[in-house]
């Protein structure tokens, strides 16, 4: 599978990195909304999380079932070294593209 990242995949990985060890679906969605103003649907989130796990860019583990969740367990996510390296490569690519652009009124042309 490709180790390149789409924009939303990068956003998801960055949100998980920001949240640390306690990153789970709802907290990841909330972090993305807080930081980007974007409100990902649960379907888009979990499809992306599953794809990133298939690409070995993150791992997941099941927490303990809780009464507050009706006996269901949370699925926690952690970015792997492969995922971190992919984010760094993607950000470097963006930086390379931005280099040399002239700023007009504070925005890139």
Task: Enumerate the language-model features and the residues they cover.
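Amphipathic alpha-helical dimerization/coiled-coil segments
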Residues: 82-109
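Exposed loop/turn and edge beta-strand positions of beta-sandwich/beta-sheet ligand-binding modules
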Residues: 73
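Basic amphipathic alpha-helical segments that dock to polyanions
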Residues: 45-52
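N-terminal helix-turn-helix DNA-binding core of bacterial DNA-binding proteins
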Residues: 2-44
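Residue-level signal for threonine
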Residues: 6, 80-82
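Alpha-helical residues within the helix-turn-helix
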Residues: 30, 53-54
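Beta-hairpin "wing" of winged helix-turn-helix
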Residues: 55-70
């Amino acid at each position: 599978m490709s180790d390149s990242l789409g924009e939303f995949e990068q956003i998801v990985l960055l949100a998980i990195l920001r949240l640390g060890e306690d990153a789970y679906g709802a907290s990841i969605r909330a972090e993305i909304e807080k930081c980007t103003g974007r409100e990902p649907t649960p379907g888009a989130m979990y499809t992306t999380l599953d794809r990133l796990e298939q690409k070995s860019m993150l791992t997941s583990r099941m927490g303990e079932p809780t009464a507050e969740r009706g006996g269901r367990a949370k699925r926690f996510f952690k970015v792997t070294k492969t995922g971190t390296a992919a984010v760094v490569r993607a950000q470097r690519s963006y930086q390379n593209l931005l280099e040399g652009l002239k700023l007009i009124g504070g925005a890139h042309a």
